[in-house]
C-alpha cells in the first residue's frame, strides 16, 4: 500500500479514537437518555469544558480529513506518490494525533501551530500532485 494511503487509514483510525474519547464523556455529561433521544430539544445542560473541547477537536478533524482524503486520492490515482508526498502524509498524521491533546488541554499557541502543520502538509500534497 502506498504510504499516503497508510497514513489516511491510520488517520481514519485516529478519528474513531477521537469519537470514542468524545462520546464517553458526552454521554456522562448529557445522560444516555438525552444522547439516545431524537434530540429535538436542547441538551439538558452544556457539555463540560473538556468534553466540549474534545467535540470541537473531533469536528475539526472531520473537516481536515476531507481535504487530506482528496490529497491522498489525487496523489494515488495520479500516480504522483513521492518521498515528499509520503512525508507530508506522515506529517499530517502526526499533526492530527498531537492536535487532540493540544486542543483538549488548551495548549496555546501550539494548537494552532500543530493545525497549521496538517494543513500545510495537505496543501503540499495537492500542489505536488499537479506538478
Model-derived features with residue positions:
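Helical transmembrane-bundle signal
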Residues: 12-22, 69, 73, 96-99, ...
Amino acid at each position: 500500500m502506498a504510504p499516503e494511503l497508510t497514513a489516511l487509514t491510520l488517520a481514519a483510525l485516529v478519528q474513531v479514537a477521537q469519537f470514542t474519547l468524545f462520546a464517553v464523556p458526552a454521554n456522562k455529561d448529557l445522560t444516555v437518555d438525552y444522547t439516545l433521544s431524537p434530540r429535538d430539544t436542547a441538551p439538558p445542560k452544556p457539555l463540560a469544558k473538556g468534553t466540549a473541547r474534545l467535540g470541537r477537536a473531533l469536528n475539526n478533524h472531520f473537516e481536515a480529513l476531507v481535504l487530506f482524503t482528496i490529497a491522498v486520492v489525487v496523489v494515488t490515482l495520479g500516480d504522483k506518490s513521492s518521498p515528499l508526498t509520503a512525508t507530508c502524509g506522515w506529517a499530517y498524521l502526526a499533526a492530527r494525533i498531537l492536535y487532540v491533546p493540544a486542543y483538549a488541554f488548551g495548549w496555546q499557541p501550539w494548537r494552532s501551530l500543530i493545525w497549521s502543520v496538517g494543513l500545510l502538509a495537505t496543501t503540499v500534497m495537492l500542489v505536488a500532485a499537479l506538478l
